Amino acid sequence: MAETETKHHPEHHDDDVHDANYQAPPEKTIEEIMAADQEDESLRRYKEALLGAAQTEKIIVEPNDPRKVIVKKLALVVEGRDDMELDLTGDLSQLKKQLFVIKEGVQYKVRIDFIVQREIVHGLKYVQKTSRLGVNVDKMKHMVGSYPPKKEIQFYLTPAEEAPSGTFSRGTYSVSSVFTDDDKHIHLEWDWTFEIKKDWA
């Protein structure tokens, strides 16, 4: 099963994930956020719109899971094709056995589906490092943003990336993904693989 609590690793992935010069603001509960700056009407309306139902009720989607962020799925999105999906709720060690095939040169996006429960989460980030034959060939880091608790699954879709192309680019690539936040909580990290081919088959 996926791990059931958020890990807090101040040093893990710091060089790749966190800006050493950035000081994250202190964590605040929903109650603290709503109580602050009440005299500012426009700010109050903004916070109400942002938090939605979370301002009046404690939103807990999965009571037996203590995490604030539960990452559900990764999908590779290519226009005109069915999404290629990885289930991130089971045995993460098995993900490398699921080989995605990507046609060289196509435009694709990565979508992360996740649940936020209990409290608002600040400064979510998605970092992906790609290597081939043990050599790092690409790294992308995306600021996902802050999200309130919701009963529905929320998602982040990266900007389009272009798959490598050409004879020497074909082959199998290893990917290490991390979903973290400003407070250096590692919500989930997982490894997966894809293969660049001349065509989809």
Identify the role of each PLM range.
Residues M1-Q154, P159-T172, S176-A201:
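N-terminal onset of structured domains
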